[in-house]
Amino acid sequence: MSTSPNKNPQTSAADQYTKPPTDDPFAHEQEGFHKGLGARQLQMIAIGSAIGTGLFLGTGSRLQDAGPMLAVIYAVIGFFGYLILRALGELILHRPSSGSFVSYTREFYGEKAAFVSGWLYWLNWAMTAVADATAIAIYISWFGRYNQFFADIPQWLSAFIVVIVTVALNLISVKLFGELEFWFALIKILALLSFMAVGIWHLVFGEPINGVTPGLSLIAANDGFFPNGILPALIVVQGVVFAYAGIELVGTTSGETKNVEKVIPRAINTVIWRIAIFYVGSVVLLCLLMPYTAYKDAESPFVTFFDAIGIDGTAPIMQLVVITAAASSLNAGLYSTGRILHSMGVAGSAPKFTTKVSRSGVPVAGILLTGVIGLFGVVLNFFVPEQAFEVVLNIASVGTMASWAAIAMSHQKYLKLVGEGKYKRPNYRAPGGRFSDWAVMVFLAVVLVLMALDYPVGTYTLASLLLVIPLLIIGWYTVRDRVNEIARVREGYTGSVPVIAARPVVKKLVPEPRTHIDLGELDAEDEDKPKGN
C-alpha cells in the first residue's frame, strides 16, 4: 500500500511520477516547454543547423588528406544523412518530442537502450561544444596577422569566453534561441552563396588565382582524384560524418514547434538541396578553384580562397562568418543536450536536477551541465592546443553515428509495429522503409571500420570506447531501479526487464487522471498482464 507523499517525505521515484491526463504515455517529457519556435525559425534551423565547424574548418585538413575525392565522400554521406532524416521525420509525425530519438528509443526498445543512446548523444554534443569552442579560438587567433592583440590572446582564454557567453544566451528562452539560430543560419547561407558566386565567376571566366587558372586541369595536374591513395581518402569519412552532425536537430525542436504536421515535412524536404548545394557544391568548387595542397589544417578553406584572390577585406569578413558558424553550432548543441537530458531526467536515466525547467521553458540544469563539459575544452586547449580540435572531432563522430543508429533502429521497430497493426503510418513516410534502415546500419558499420584504420587518432578514439562502455554499464546499474520504478506507471512502455511491457496501441482508453499512482494497486493488476519480451 502506498503512502501519500505528504505523510512520508521519503517517497519513491514512481510515487512522485505524475501520470499525464492524456493518451500519450510520454507527454510527461514535454511538461514545462513552450511552443516558441515558428515555421520561419525551423526552416532556417533545418537548412543551417549542420553548417558548422565540420564544413568551415574541418574541410581544409580533409582536402589535404583526400584531395578532390572529398566531394564524392560528402555526397555519399549526405545521401545516408538524408535517409536518416526522413526516418526521423516519420517518427516526429508519429509523436513530436523534445526528447527526439532518445524518446523514440525508449518507446520502442525500452529504458536501457534509451539510457545508452541518450548519454552517447550527450557525449557527442558535449564534445562538439569543445570542438566549436576550440575552432572559435583558432579563428580569433587568425586575426593576429592584422593586430597583435588577437595574437596575444591565449587559445584557452578565447574558448572559455565563448562557452560562458553562449551558455548565458541559451538560458534566456527558446524564442531567443530560435532568433539567434535564424540569423546565424542566414549569415552562413549568404556567406556560402557569396563564395559560390565569386568562385563560379573565377571558374567561368578563367580568372587566375595565385597565378594558376582554375578548372578540371587543376585536378589532373595534382595527381587526380586520389592524390594520396584510396585508403587516405576513405578514412576521412569520420570527419565528414562530424560535418553532418546536427541534421537531427529538427527532431529536438519538434517538441517546441507550432504546426508540426506542416512545418516538419517542409523543413526536412529542403535538406537534400542543402546537401547538394552547400556541401557537395562548395567542396567541388574548392577543388576546382585551387590545388588541394593550398588548403591548410588550422584555417577555413573559404578564408584561404578569399585570401588568395586578394580582394581587400573579404578574407576577414569570411573569417567572421566562420566564427558565426561555430557559435551557431555551439548554440544548437547546448539547446539540444538540454532537452535530451530533460527527457532522460524525467525517465530517471539522468540526474533528477536535469528536469528543472525555468519559467521561460528552458531546461536550465541540462544546459549548465553541458556547459561545464564545454569548459573541459578550455583545459584541452591549454595543454594541447594543436591537437584539441581533431581529438574531440573523432569522439563526437562516434556519438553522431550512435545517434543515427538509434534513429534507424527506432524507425525499423516502428515499422514492425505498424505491420502488426499497432500504429498507422503518417502520410509523410521515409523512402525505402526498413530496407533504408538496414542500409544505414551497414553504412555506419563500414564507417567504424574505416575509423579504426585511421591510426593513431581514429584507432585511439575507438579504443576509448573500452572506457566509455564500462562507464555506461556502471551508470545503468546505478539508475536502473529508479528508471524501472518510474517506467512501471507509464502506459505503453516497451522495456524488456524487469517491468511490465504492454505494447503500445493506436488508441487506448485512459482512466480518469489521478495525481499519483498506487504502486501496490499496479502490482496486483500486473499479474494479469502479459510480460514484455
Regions flagged by a language model, labelled:
Residues 154-213, 268-272, 393-406, 436-439, ...:
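Membrane-interface loop-to-helix entry segments
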Residues 103-105, 110, 142-147, 217-223, ...:
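TM-loop-TM module centered on a large, flexible mid-protein loop between adjacent transmembrane helices
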Residues 33-37, 47, 57-158, 271-276, ...:
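Extracellular loop-to-transmembrane helix junctions
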Residues 37-56, 61, 162-165, 219-280, ...:
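Hydrophobic, membrane-embedded alpha-helices of multi-pass small-molecule transporters
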Residues 1-60, 64-69, 82, 86, ...:
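Membrane-interface "cap" regions at the ends of multi-pass membrane proteins
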Residues 195, 203, 391, 395-403, ...:
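A generic transmembrane alpha-helix motif of multi-pass inner-membrane proteins
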Residues 187-221, 284-289, 404-421, 479-484:
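Hydrophobic alpha-helical segments and their helix-loop junctions in multi-pass secondary transporters
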Residues 184, 353-364, 404-455, 491-494:
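C-terminal membrane-solvent junction of multi-pass transporters and transport-like membrane proteins
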